[in-house]
Amino acid sequence: MHIFDELKERGLIFQTTDEEALRKALEEGQVSYYTGYDPTADSLHLGHLVAILTSRRLQLAGHKPYALVGGATGLIGDPSFKDAERSLQTKDTVDGWVKSIQGQLSRFLDFENGENKAVMVNNYDWFGSISFIDFLRDIGKYFTVNYMMSKESVKKRIETGISYTEFAYQIMQGYDFFVLNQDHNVTLQIGGSDQWGNMTAGTELLRRKADKTGHVITVPLITDATGKKFGKSEGNAVWLNPEKTSPYEMYQFWMNVMDADAVRFLKIFTFLSLDEIEDIRKQFEAAPHERLAQKVLAREVVTLVHGEEAYKEALNITEQLFAGNIKNLSVKELKQGLRGVPNYQVQADENNNIVELLVSSGIVNSKRQAREDVQNGAIYVNGDRIQDLDYVLSDADKLENELTVIRRGKKKYFVLTY
């Protein structure tokens, strides 16, 4: 299958410039293309993964990727479809974020092998040395204010106000495309659908300043079956950095994907063939309660992002927590699996009677409730049911001398640290 058709079949093409010309270019030989990543945090998140994996698919098809990290544009801020001005960051902060993002991209693109090995570029390399006068004379004169204000991403900000700094962002992104075309013969840009206005600023600059044709592919902004923006868990971004979102948390995110989205996400976020995904779809629809599509999705993406060992660890944590086998997990694994649950500091030398402890830590509201929970068998210490009202936590209950896990009922976990 032609790479363009495969991208379409996987639901990865939202919009393109001249499709016929783009198809022809991809058929005739190796195309150099780029995707830009502005450092707005110290990590990329799941929302970035759609463009990253699309870039990788094109590389596997023989085309050459350039990964542009916006050391300059990250200092300015993209106004596209944002309600308010971004907070400006210091150069030291942005430089640190650039390094982090460059490291993450190397997990997905091949920067070492073959004539189409990926190349990392930073747009601070050309913007850092250009003077304001040169910027206006050599770049700005190719953009009319009318053209710039016609962009949907700008229109939405006109009423509330947009600074010249952010207004000029589209010119900077357009110039990125121009520089990469002149220096590396890059003729295609890939980005999110919210970037269409900025990306076509690049094709316009190429046409007017160099009389060349540039191509654009936008990938869709992914939403779930309810229309909710994809890539957040409990309102928080799902990061690619394991320190910010653990492999276990990412595993759980994919396991909790709705049935209506699971097969579609397999096409977007995995490298399984379309035939393999079709087989999974049939099995999944025959027995949706077994959650095969979610299990495969979690396995493939966690392995892709964090490696096979991290996936196995996340799976083991899931299975042991589900079975209540707390003692089968290390403290490191427990911290990963129970991140975000209520955590209480306990004095090691206190007389930690189970009833007193349940109340003082806030796990229950009263001694009466605590006694009822214990007597009814609803309280577990490190996976062991406790029904003795006189039970006192001892050193033996301190896992690796660091924490104790309390469970109330089937699912409510609490961590006591010493």
From Swiss-Prot:
A single GO BP annotation from the record? tyrosyl-tRNA aminoacylation
Reaction catalysed by this enzyme: tRNA(Tyr) + L-tyrosine + ATP = L-tyrosyl-tRNA(Tyr) + AMP + diphosphate + H(+)
| 'HIGH' region (motif): residue ranges | 39-48
The cellular component terms of Gene Ontology attached to this UniProt record, alphabetical and capped at eight, are: cytosol
Quick one: which residues bind ATP? K232
Main localisation, per the record? Answer: cytoplasm
Q: Which CDD domains match?
A: S4, TyrRS_core
What the entry lists under Pfam families is as follows: SYY_C-terminal (PF22421), tRNA-synt_1b (PF00579)
> Motif span ('KMSKS' region)?
229-233
Residues binding L-tyrosine are Y34, Y169, Q173
EC numbers on record: 6.1.1.1
User: Per the database record, which ranges form the S4 RNA-binding domain?
Assistant: 352-418
State the compartments where it is located.
Cytoplasm
Which GO MF terms does the UniProt record name?
Answer: ATP binding; RNA binding; tyrosine-tRNA ligase activity
UniProt keyword terms in alphabetical order: Aminoacyl-tRNA synthetase, ATP-binding, Cytoplasm, Ligase, Nucleotide-binding, Protein biosynthesis, RNA-binding
User: Which top EC class applies here?
Assistant: ligase
Stored InterPro entries: aa-tRNA-synth_I_CS, aa-tRNA-synth_Ic, Rossmann-like_a/b/a_fold, S4_RNA-bd, S4_RNA-bd_sf, SYY-like_C, Tyr-tRNA-ligase, Tyr-tRNA-ligase_bac-type
**Which Gene3D superfamilies is this protein grouped with?**
HUPs, RNA-binding S4 domain, Tyrosyl-Transfer RNA Synthetase
Q: Does the keyword Nucleotide-binding apply?
A: yes
Family the UniProt entry places it in? Belongs to the class-I aminoacyl-tRNA synthetase family. TyrS type 1 subfamily.
Q: How is the subunit organization of this protein annotated in UniProt?
A: Homodimer.
Q: What does this protein do?
A: Catalyzes the attachment of tyrosine to tRNA(Tyr) in a two-step reaction: tyrosine is first activated by ATP to form Tyr-AMP and then transferred to the acceptor end of tRNA(Tyr).
What protein name applies here? Tyrosine--tRNA ligase
Q: What is the lineage of its organism?
A: Bacteria, Bacillati, Bacillota, Bacilli, Lactobacillales
